Amino acid sequence: MTIRRTLPGLAVGALVMSLSLALSAGPATTAIAEARVPAAPTVSEQQVMPHLRALQRIADRNGGNRAHGTKGYAQSVAYVKSALDRAGFRTRLVPFIHDGATGNNLIADWPGGDPDHVLLTGAHLDSVKEGPGINDNGSGSAAVLATALQVAESGLKPERHLRFAWWGAEEQGLIGSQSYVSKLSGADRRRIDVYLNFDQAGSRNTRQWLVVHDDEHGETEAQQAFEAWFAERSIPTFDIGVGGSDHESFGNAVIPSSGFSTGISDCIHEACDNLANVDPKTETTSTDAIVGVLWKLAATAPRH
């Protein structure tokens, strides 16, 4: 993942965003938009970390990993799917084949919202064979799952359609997400307003959140929303390009994307990427950011 600084500082970034928003919408429009946004719930550590503990247990009983083509990955998919099914999501498995093994992407749709304007939020669920992948990327998967469950618990009625995804075989080269995107029709691609990707959301020693900047589409509303969310809490951010994770699959298909990462933790792609490799506070903050921004984007009337 190539990191580059696109703004000299948070203060300037916040000022630029404020000026941009002021120019793009009049006072009345802004007031209406703000009035429509329901208050986002706050997520606790107890609503996120149990999912990571579950993924650790799955790895422990399956040779220490949750890699593509293994029982560990299949059980990880089953765990997430079961939680979503109980919450009222419409779930489906989308199979693909890589290196002679069948894998599944898990797709979950929340009923309602404009099907011509989809907010797609995702993370890869697989690990490398060398370790359990609890930060890379159990942390992103758990944050997305906790967000989806908050949608259900709150009974959110979004303006846009909400879809969540957990990708397989990312560690082999973005295979699952590439397979999914390649099978979308042109019309289905255009229905996705933005794809939000989260890879490594709980890294230890995190000092700043790395927010995805989409060079193809410029500063998306999602990027603006994430940077504003963090700025309001005096949390530093750093712009990164689209690449190195599943948002690249969408970028290659000219689908707008954003999201964030907390960078590489103390251990990556080894057996030490276990539960101890995740900082619960960072993981919870990441999940709160996803919830807060998703609530904002979901309540925004689609631009026709």
Residue positions per predicted region:
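Alpha-helical metal-binding/catalytic segments enriched in His/Glu/Asp
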Residues: T121, L125-L174, I290
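His/Asp/Glu-rich mid-to-C-terminal helical/loop segments that flank catalytic regions of hydrolases
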Residues: D266-H304
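Extracytoplasmic/secreted proteins, especially bacterial periplasmic and envelope-associated proteins
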Residues: P38, Q47-P50, A54, K71-T91, ...
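Metal-dependent peptidase/peptidase-like ectodomains
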Residues: W167-S265
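Secretory targeting and sorting signals
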Residues: M1-A33
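N-terminal capping segment at the start of a domain
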Residues: E34-K71, D126, L196, Q200-S203, ...
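Second-shell loop/turn segments in exported
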Residues: R36-V43, R61-G72, R90, P95-I97, ...
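A non-catalytic alpha/beta surface segment that caps or lines the substrate-entry region
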Residues: R53, R57-P111
